[in-house]
Amino acid sequence: MILRNSPVKLGDMKTFFKRLVLGLLTLIVAASLLIAIEYFGAQPMGLFSGSRPTDLGFKNGAFAKPSWKPNAVSSTIDKADETHYIAPIHFSGDAASSWSKLTAAVKAQTGARVIAEQADYLYAEFKSAGMGFVDDVEFALDAKADVIHMRSASRLGVRDLGVNRRRVEILRSQIAAK
């Protein structure tokens, strides 16, 4: 209640409460950010990196099947799955040379970090600029069939706006050009 002879005016009280509410909201947002950083801070790549999948690898001639989400592509699934299927990289000639070209092309990509590199398997994480979303990308050399199988999948979200498909198509074109 404001007294008639009070030196505090109604306009001053409104300003005071606006500033109080703004200050409290700022504290709440700051506390939420600190909690999020504490919770997600153990992950090496940031808040939007997600967790590394546990089903990585090329087993029995195939990668793990993509989820229902349209943010992944794989060359080892049924061709009828138009959302997820992508053709493997076909090569002619020396398998080791084609594999070497692929490995070099992956390492040269912005945001790429090779996690596992073997004679016939490559696993890399691709971190997007800005928000730091991470995609898991795998390649497997099938020298007998003259192909390199691939799988590229987003860890988070539902749609990737074609990022995973474009990535492997760019790598395909870079290998063909060399």
What would you call each of these model-derived segments?
Residues L27-I28:
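Acidic, proline/glycine-enriched N-terminal capping motif
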Residues K14-G23, L33-K178:
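Ser/Thr-rich, low-complexity intrinsically disordered terminal regions
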Residues M1-R19:
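N-terminal Lys/Arg-rich, disordered targeting/topogenic segments
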